[in-house]
Amino acid sequence: VEDRLSKVFAALADPLRRDMVARLAADDATVNELAEPYDVSVQAVSKHIKVLEDAGLVRRSRQAQRRPVHLEAEVFDLMTAWIERYRRQVEERYRRLDDLLAGEARSDTDTDTEGAAS
């Protein structure tokens, strides 16, 4: 799983590939269609698609003469699970810190109240 995640995150490190993934989330597209808005060759886009494909983020199919690129949703479930695990750990750390700070604030208030009463 970690090796697969490494490939996914490495593939998404490139802004052009992230943009392609965002576009594919809206609809399937051919390599030529994906290349249209960019100032790069179709061959360069093909190489980017290959990286995304190797990471399991996309797959190509054949529909008559078209070879549309599809986004693979299951990889996003894998990434979400990984992120969620660490998000929960961080939230727990912040909760403990909040509890500690609240306890110190109560302690300071108690000390101030005792000092004022003297």
Predicted feature residues:
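C-terminal regulatory/oligomerization modules of transcriptional regulators
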Residues: 1-4, 23-37, 42, 54, ...
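Interfacial catalytic loop of ABC nucleotide-binding domains
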Residues: 7
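Short helix-coil-helix linker/hinge
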Residues: 11-16
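Pre-recognition alpha-helix immediately N-terminal to the DNA-recognition helix
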Residues: 18-20
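Short, hydrophobic-biased segments on the C-terminal half of alpha helices
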Residues: 49-50
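Short, Lys/Arg-rich nucleic-acid/phosphate-binding segment
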Residues: 62-68
